[in-house]
Amino acid sequence: MFGKGGLGNLMKQAQQMQEKMQQMQEEIAKLEVTGESGAGLVKVTINGAHNCRRVEIDPSLLEDDKEMLEDLVAAAFNDAARRIEETQKEKMASVSSGMQLPPGFKMPF
């Protein structure tokens, strides 16, 4: 199944991959992205751990319907969560690129 030194090389690659993934996860946790709704009237900023860091609401919305404002805040948060997920996938894909994995081997482990 594995050629001469193949298993050893695979284990070495797996260890390197694990180190890179841990480093990438630390970087991702520090990332901040901003989601928007209502054409930018509501903005929610979250970090890579999905913790809300900031909520910005245009003053014009404070006079409007409370339910609409709540919906806009939820939509902005969901937009931010979607953006951080996309960023995480892109960064993690870059970690595994270049590895010579056996067919059918899925990452992360």
Swiss-Prot record:
GO terms for molecular function: DNA binding. Binds to DNA and alters its conformation. May be involved in regulation of gene expression, nucleoid organization and DNA protection. This is Nucleoid-associated protein CKO_02678. Residues 89-109 are annotated as: Disordered. The keyword DNA-binding applies. Keywords: Cytoplasm, DNA-binding. It comes from Citrobacter koseri (strain ATCC BAA-895 / CDC 4225-83 / SGSC4696). Its main location: cytoplasm. The keyword DNA-binding applies. It holds the Pfam family YbaB_DNA_bd. Homodimer. It is found in: Cytoplasm, Nucleoid. Belongs to the YbaB/EbfC family. GO terms for cellular component: bacterial nucleoid; cytosol.
